[in-house]
């Protein structure tokens, strides 16, 4: 169990480190016009696992928890951070659920804006972003798999 928990903590750390790259990218979207802003109360679900990935979100204020489909916390994001990019960039439905931890104001970045920014980006940078997005999805799935296995093991010990 100890090594399983360490592995999950490691995957959560990797996920946070990869999000630093997306934090740097957020500056590209900060000055974008025509962004809708939406307010969420603490506990509100912003999007759920398997929802269509039509938008990317930028936290203007507040905190957002990212969790796996079975409720494993994958990270807490704060003001200035982007989320929802993975499914959008790799063109798959949402692989996680996003929940407002505190009352939050979220800027919604539409698909057209994202495509314009990505098309203007250096092709190498665009490839790096896509590769990191794939790795985040894989790391999240692996963390959840091990978390579920640990829960089964714990239930057998009782």
Pin down the residues of each PLM region.
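Short hydrophobic/aromatic patches on the structural cores and recognition surfaces of FHA
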Residues: 43, 62, 80, 98, ...
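A short, compositionally biased micro-patch
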Residues: 51, 59, 69, 91, ...
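Local beta-strand/beta-hairpin segments that build beta-sheet-rich folds
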Residues: 46, 73-74
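Cyclic-nucleotide recognition modules
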Residues: 76-129
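A small-molecule sensor/coupling module
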Residues: 114-153
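Regulatory nucleotide-sensing modules
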Residues: 22-67
């Amino acid at each position: 169990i100890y090594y399983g928990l360490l592995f999950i903590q490691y995957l959560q750390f990797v996920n946070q480190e990869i999000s630093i790259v997306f934090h740097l990218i957020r500056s590209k979207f900060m000055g974008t016009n025509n962004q809708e802003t939406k307010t969420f109360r603490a506990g509100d679900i912003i999007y759920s696992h398997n929802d269509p990935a039509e938008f990317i979100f930028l936290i203007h204020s507040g905190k957002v928890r990212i969790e796996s489909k079975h409720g494993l916390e994958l990270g807490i994001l704060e003001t200035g951070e982007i989320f929802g990019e993975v499914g959008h960039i790799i063109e798959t439905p949402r692989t996680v659920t996003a929940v407002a931890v505190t009352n939050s104001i979220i800027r919604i970045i539409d698909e057209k804006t994202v495509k314009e920014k990505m098309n203007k980006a250096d092709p190498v940078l665009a490839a790096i972003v896509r590769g990191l997005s794939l790795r985040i999805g894989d790391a999240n799935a692996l963390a959840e798999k091990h978390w579920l296995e640990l829960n089964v093991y714990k239930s057998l010990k009782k």
